[in-house]
């Protein structure tokens, strides 16, 4: 009986194989009356009865849900042949893989074919196959669809994440604390402003002395520039002008000796040796000043009896200092001497 049942099952599977491939994954088992359930992603289940169109007599009836060991052996022998035949007829579709996925609403690509002997293994495909009382075979007809699904929704590859990591580290390394030099900062352009530690103030040489004979003083000024800065600054942006005031001398200023405009030479010019004495006094009184110092207040002559005259002298000295500072910035403009006005 076992070889006859196996041969009969093989003939029926050969006849019904192409028909099952055209019915979107429906496989008709070689039974006269069998219940077939269709599930296409929704909770709705449709059941109908199909009659195998064969000329078999009614007494040769094959029942798959029988618990007979002979039928189980026949099913086990015909299982590999049926699996190979159905694997050749690949069909696509959607079906629920388990009852849990049916509740979630998630679907699995590929037709999942369950060939079992009892209704429990047919309703729950996740049950343990090949148990003592039942025989179950579960395979995926379309085995390439899961791979295609994976390639269409590829996650971020680890190689790409490692390539993006140095870029993020470079971006983070640019945000450093003030005063520090970032390691991966791009090279600055030649016209860009250098860092504060690279800027140095360089004072220019002193200009010529400007005599103020009526006030008895002389002054000179010098400007400064930022070393390491390419380009030009606007006038007045540096604000590093230095001015030096000293009492005038007859050696450096063409002042009138008779009017005693220079106060340092007044007490020394008492006789004909005034020129030699003034030269000596100039050498002794001229002292070097530091290179960078704050502006000192101009030395004023002894207090005059008229307060208004002393006030306007201070105003004139201040205006002359401003003019000399501006003239040192504009090199083409020469300061105007008071005696030439």
UniProtKB/Swiss-Prot annotation:
Signal peptide: 1-23
InterPro entries noted in UniProt: MENT (IPR029292)
Feature: compositional bias, Polar residues: 127-155
Subcellular location: Secreted
Gene Ontology annotations of biological process type: regulation of cell population proliferation
Tissue spec: Plasma. Overexpressed in lymphomas.
Region feature Disordered, mapped onto this chain: 115-196
A Pfam family the protein falls into: PMSI1
Record PTM: Phosphorylation sites are present in the extracellular medium.
A Gene Ontology cellular-component term: extracellular region
First-listed, main subcellular location of the protein, grouped into a coarse class: secreted
Keywords: Phosphoprotein, Secreted, Signal
Role description: Involved in control of cellular proliferation. Onconcogenic modifier contributing to the tumor suppressor function of DNMT3B.
Official protein name in the record: Protein MENT
Species this chain originates from: Homo sapiens (Human)
Gene name, Swiss-Prot/TrEMBL: MENT
């Amino acid at each position: 009986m076992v070889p006859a049942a196996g041969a009969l099952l093989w003939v029926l599977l050969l006849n019904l194989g192409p028909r099952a491939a055209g019915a979107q994954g429906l496989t008709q088992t070689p039974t006269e009356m069998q219940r077939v359930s269709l599930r296409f992603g929704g909770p709705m289940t449709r059941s109908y009865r199909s009659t195998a169109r064969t000329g078999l007599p009614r007494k040769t009836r094959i029942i798959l849900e029988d618990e007979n060991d002979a039928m189980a052996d026949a099913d086990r022998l015909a299982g590999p042949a049926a699996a190979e035949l159905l694997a050749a007829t690949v069909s696509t579709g959607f079906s629920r893989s388990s009852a849990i996925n049916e509740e979630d609403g998630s679907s699995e690509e590929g037709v999942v074919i369950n060939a079992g002997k009892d209704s429990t293994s047919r309703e729950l495909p996740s049950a343990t196959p090949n148990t003592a009382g039942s025989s179950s075979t579960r395979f995926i007809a379309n085995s390439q669809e899961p791979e295609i699904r994976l390639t269409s929704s590829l996650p971020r590859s680890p190689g790409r994440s490692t390539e993006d990591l140095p870029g993020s580290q470079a971006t983070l390394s640019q945000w450093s604390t003030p005063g520090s030099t970032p390691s991966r900062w791009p090279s600055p352009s030649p016209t860009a402003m250098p860092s504060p530690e690279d800027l140095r103030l360089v004072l220019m040489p002193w200009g010529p002395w400007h005599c103020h004979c009526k006030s008895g003083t002389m002054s000179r000024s010098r400007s400064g520039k930022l070393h390491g800065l390419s380009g030009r600054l606007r006038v007045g942006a540096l604000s590093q002008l230095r001015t030096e005031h000293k009492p005038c001398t007859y050696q450096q200023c063409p002042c009138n000796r008779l009017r005693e405009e220079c106060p340092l030479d007044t007490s020394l010019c008492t006789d004909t040796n005034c020129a030699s004495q003034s030269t000596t006094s100039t050498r002794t009184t001229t002292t070097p000043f530091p290179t960078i110092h704050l502006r000192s207040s101009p030395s004023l002559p002894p207090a005059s009896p008229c307060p208004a005259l002393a006030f306007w002298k201070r105003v004139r000295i201040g205006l002359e200092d401003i003019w000399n500072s501006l003239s040192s910035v504009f090199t083409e403009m020469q300061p105007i001497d008071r005696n030439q006005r």
